[in-house]
Amino acid sequence: MKYMITSKGDEKSDLLRLNMIAGFGEYDMEYDEIEPEIVISIGGDGTFLSAFHQYEERLDEIAFIGIHTGHLGFYADWRPAEADKLVKLLAKGEYQKVSYPLLKTTVKYGIGKKEAEYLALNESTVKSSGGPFVVDVVINDLHFERFRGDGLCMSTPSGTTAYNKSLGGALMHPSIEAMQLTEMASINNRVYRTIGSPLVFPKHHVVSLQPVNDKDFQISVDHLSILHRDVQEIRYEVSAKKVHFARFRSFPFWRRVHDSFIED
């Protein structure tokens, strides 16, 4: 089996990476950064996101594993003390694949420029590059509202525990193939109104954000943020692709939520 290990880059994570590579050396495991079947992320959810995007073109052939060397993460759920056990389990191939939905973002520009597509594990956000943020929200070709505010966030089910949660969005179980739109400081008064609630869309829905005045936007996809100019439309939909995780034990989603945000 081919595998690779990525590290956060701190001393603890780097040392654990070297120890695991040495451990895999005792088994029929091949280290391969080009075409790995298993990608192990050591660090936190940020490190995991980087690993995901590094291999997003090969998602169908890869299963991911996260080891946290800091706080418990939603993607990094193994502890460093369990690394030896994980090496043995992987060498035996004793795992199941669990799949989570992803978000597809398409940015369309003015005449002459090719559209851009992005894949998000957590979320995509849209904000103005400087002036007022005003867009028409169109759902399945039906004009829904004209939004005015700081911006909008579209998240995956697993991503609802991230930025979406801080915006007051609902938490969604990753088995639900859907996406959730939340507002950032919307303007609501006698003149301007928005729905004022998070919206959840099933996988066959397409949400289009269409600029009203300003066509320059700061668009983020997970940890990547880029200034896009002359934007004509931003389209969101549940991607046909999925991310796969190697699971060796039961660790329910709601247990992760409890341990991360409540923990008695």
Curated annotation (Swiss-Prot):
Its cofactor is a divalent metal cation. It is found in: Cytoplasm. Keywords: ATP-binding, Cytoplasm, Kinase, NAD, NADP, Nucleotide-binding, Transferase. It is an enzyme of class 2 (transferase). Coiled coil: none annotated. One of its GO terms (biological process) is NADP biosynthetic process. Its EC number is 2.7.1.23. Pfam families: NAD_kinase (PF01513), NAD_kinase_C (PF20143). One of its GO terms (molecular function) is ATP binding. SUPFAM superfamilies: NAD kinase/diacylglycerol kinase-like (SSF111331). NAD(+) binds at residues 45-46, 122-123, 148, 150, 161-166, 185. It comes from the Bacteria. Its main location: cytoplasm. GO terms for cellular component: cytoplasm. It catalyses: NAD(+) + ATP = ADP + NADP(+) + H(+). The keyword Transcription does not apply. The active site is at 45 (proton acceptor). NCBIfam families: PRK04885.1. Belongs to the NAD kinase family. Involved in the regulation of the intracellular balance of NAD and NADP, and is a key enzyme in the biosynthesis of NADP. Catalyzes specifically the phosphorylation on 2'-hydroxyl of the adenosine moiety of NAD to yield NADP. This is NAD kinase 1.
